[in-house]
């Protein structure tokens, strides 16, 4: 059932799916998932699950 949830996200905004297609290192940020998210080396600008563009 969780797969359907990811599928909806992909259909809504496929351009946001850059690295991970289903989960981001064990969790689903519902947005883009850069590799730095896995190593926690992302700059403290945008929070996972939110788009502050």
Swiss-Prot record:
Modification 4-hydroxyproline, positions: 14, 29, 34-35, 43-44, 48
Propeptide: 1-12, 49-53
Signal peptide start and end residues: none
Pfam families to which the protein is assigned, alphabetical: Toxin_8
PTM comment: Contains 3 disulfide bonds.
Record key words, sorted: Amidation, Disulfide bond, Gamma-carboxyglutamic acid, Glycoprotein, Hydroxylation, Ion channel impairing toxin, Neurotoxin, Secreted, Toxin
Gene Ontology CC terms, in alphabetical order: extracellular region
Subcellular location: Secreted
Chief subcellular location: secreted
Modified residues (4-carboxyglutamate): 15
UniProt record similarity statement: Belongs to the conotoxin A superfamily.
Record comment regarding domains: The cysteine framework is IV (CC-C-C-C-C).
Record protein name field: Conotoxin Bu27
Lineage, opening ranks: Eukaryota, Metazoa, Spiralia, Lophotrochozoa, Mollusca
């Amino acid at each position: 059932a969780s797969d359907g949830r990811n599928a909806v996200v992909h259909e809504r905004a496929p351009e946001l799916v850059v690295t991970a297609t289903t989960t981001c290192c064990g969790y689903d940020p519902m947005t883009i998932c850069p590799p730095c998210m896995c190593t926690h080396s992302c700059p403290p600008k945008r929070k996972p699950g939110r788009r502050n563009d």
